[in-house]
Structure formats: C-alpha cells, structure tokens
Design a protein with these regions (language model features):
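Single, function-defining residue in the core of a domain
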Residues: 27-28, 59-61, 68-356
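Active-site-proximal, Lys/Arg-enriched surface segment
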Residues: 1-72
Length: 356
C-alpha cells in the first residue's frame, strides 16, 4: 500500500545510560560500585543502566539493556560471586557489567539487527560520540549524535585535522536567528565522510554540534531525529518514578537485579503497546495519516473562514439581526484576528462578502 503521508516515518534506535541507586543498607549487593552520575556530577553507590531502545517517532520500546558496575576494580565495593558457573548466562551478564559501556554498544546493536528489528539510524548523546566508536557502529547502522569539543577528537576539513571549536571558526555562519548556523562535510579518522551541523544554543559558546554519518539527509531532518532522543529520557523517568525501578526490591543477588530490571522494561513496553492500540489514533495507520493530511491541508485562513461561517449561521438562527449588521460584526472580528496574527501585509484571499 502506498503511504498517504507526505512525511516519511523513520524507525531508529536510541541508546543512553542512567544511574540506578540501591537502598543504602544493602552494601553487600554483588558488583555494587561507585558510578558517576552526570546529572549531579557526583559519584554515587549503585549501577548504570545502559539501555537500547527502538522508536518510530511516536512510540518507544526498550529492547536491550546492560546493568553496569564499574570497569575499574578500585571503584567496585564487591566483586563477582566466585560460586557462579562461568558457563552460564548469569556469569556472562556479570562480565558485561564490568566492561566499558562503549565496548557494549556494537554487540547490542548487532543483536537487535540480528533478531530482525528494523531501524535506519542510531541516535546517541555526546557521551558515546567518540570518533572511534562512531567508526565502529557505522559499519552496521547510520549514526546521529551530539558532539563534544575535546582536543583529541579531530575532524578533517580541507586537508587539516581540527577540533570542533576550530572547525566552527573556519566556517561561514548564517546571520540572524537562523536555526542552523553552519553545515559542513568532514572526514572522520576512518577516512569516511560525515556531516556536522552547528545549531545555536544558550550556552556560553553559543552553539551545539550534531553529526550524521548519512550525508544524504537534510540538516533539518538531522535536528528532528536527534530531538526524538528525548523519548528515552521519558522512558527512564517513567521507569524510576512510576514503575518502581529498584525501589520495590531489596536484593543482594545480581541475577535478581537483572530479573527485576527486565520486568520493569516489560511493563513499560506493555503500557506502550496498550497506549498505541487503545488510545493513540495513530494505530489506525494510513487511515489516520489520510485524515491528518486532510486537516493539515486546510490553511489558517480557510479554517478561520469556516469558523466565521458557523458563527454567522448561529447568529441568523438565534437573533433577529439584519444581514448588514451580521456582516459588519464578522468583518470586525476578521480584521482584528488578522491584525492579531500579524497577517496584515500577507497576500490574502478576498473573504469579505463571502460568508454565506
């Protein structure tokens, strides 16, 4: 069936990590460690939940996770239970817990693709946008991510390897309140091309940088898709505040923590499916998009005209007013509305006298 929507629906993966805390008294939790919480910029006792999710821009589902301790032995309060059989999945999970998060990104993405989950992009925050990681992941899927300005993260432009702020200084910027200040094609350390766009922000330096390994898409689409990464932040908030992630258990066993996290993620996915099928009209698919397209095709002036026609019909039925008075009232309202929305100087269709 041919899609009735003028906008292409893009499926994508999103990956992010958040800090999960254990109860203060459970100091003997297996693999408990000091983990850095980026939101508070402090070290806390607990784990980091690295999550891979899937989204079509409307619904989000968690599809894989790793419950991470610290890769540094000095930051771990407790080690792996020596009684665990090394041939079991539980032991593999424990080995995964003491692996750097950047080393887990590729196997998580490969496993998701292997089981048949379709996505065109992987959207990431700046914590994972290391050039070497991007080069590894782009062998499997296109990457869209925010970039950090670090001295050893270099991008080749016109034969010179530049850090991000130096690259920005070389580019011609758009003036005024442009949504995109600059856009450029660069070469990554692996020799492959990527697009970097700079957008304005309120930070001291005045810009943020986004990278896409797919150089065929528009700059505006890169911004739109990166903005959809917010869904995974909502996922974490829902799991912590409403689905009782970590809060409903007191357990020392690492397998128990994995099982609990799996159940919380399953609850969220069930709620997402229920909302999509029972509440969200987008579950009607192309029928919804056809109706939505019809609504979008009505211009502001056409919509306002229809409202005025309805108001005129009500006035005729409810009050004994002459056509001259009714038209004067509607002309006054229309004039005020046009002035309010700043459309005085815009080309307008002649609506006066055409209210019937």
């Amino acid at each position: 069936m041919t899609s009735l929507s003028p906008y292409k629906i893009v499926n994508f993966f999103s990956i992010e990590a958040t800090t999960t805390l254990t109860h203060r008294v459970l100091k003997k939790v297996e693999l408990l460690s000091r983990v850095f919480d980026h939101s508070t910029s402090k070290y806390l006792k607990g784990f980091r939940l690295l999550t891979l999710g899937w989204s079509d821009g409307n619904s989000f589902s968690g599809i894989d996770f790793a419950l991470l301790s610290s890769a540094k032995e000095k930051n771990r309060y407790n080690e792996i239970n020596p009684g665990i059989d090394k041939r079991t999945c539980g032991y593999q999970r424990r080995k995964e817990a003491i692996t750097k998060s950047t080393k887990l990104l590729e196997p998580m993405v490969k496993n998701a693709i292997k089981i048949g989950i379709q996505a065109k992009y992987l959207v990431m925050d700046s914590w994972f946008s290391i050039p070497s990681v991007i080069s590894t992941l782009r062998n499997h899927i296109h990457i869209i991510c925010m970039l950090k300005d670090l001295p050893n993260w270099l991008y080749e432009y016109k034969g010179k390897k530049l850090r991000l702020k130096d690259l920005y200084g070389k580019l011609k910027k758009k003036r005024g309140k442009a949504k995109i200040k600059a856009s450029v094609l660069v070469t990554l350390p692996d020799g492959k091309k990527a697009r970097i766009i700079f957008v304005p922000c309120d930070k001291k330096r005045g810009w943020l940088a986004l990278l896409s390994t797919d150089i065929s898409i528009a700059d505006e689409e890169i911004i739109r898709l990166y903005g959809k990464r917010w869904d995974i932040e909502v996922f974490f908030k829902m799991c912590k505040q409403h689905l009782k992630l970590v809060k409903e258990i007191q357990i020392r066993n690492y397998d128990g923590l994995i099982g609990h996290t799996s159940l919380v993620m399953a609850r969220y996915n069930i709620l997402t499916l229920f909302q999509r099928e029972s509440v969200d009209q987008r579950s009607f698919g192309d029928l919804f998009r056809a109706c939505n397209e019809e609504l979008a095709s009505i211009t502001f002036i056409d919509a306002l005209k229809r409202i005025m026609q309805l108001a005129m019909s009500v006035l005729r039925k409810a009050h004994n007013l002459s056509e001259t008075i009714i038209n004067s009232i509607l002309d006054l309202i229309m004039g005020e509305a046009i002035a309010y929305f700043g459309l005085n100087n815009s080309p307008m269709p002649q609506l006066k006298g055409d209210w019937g």
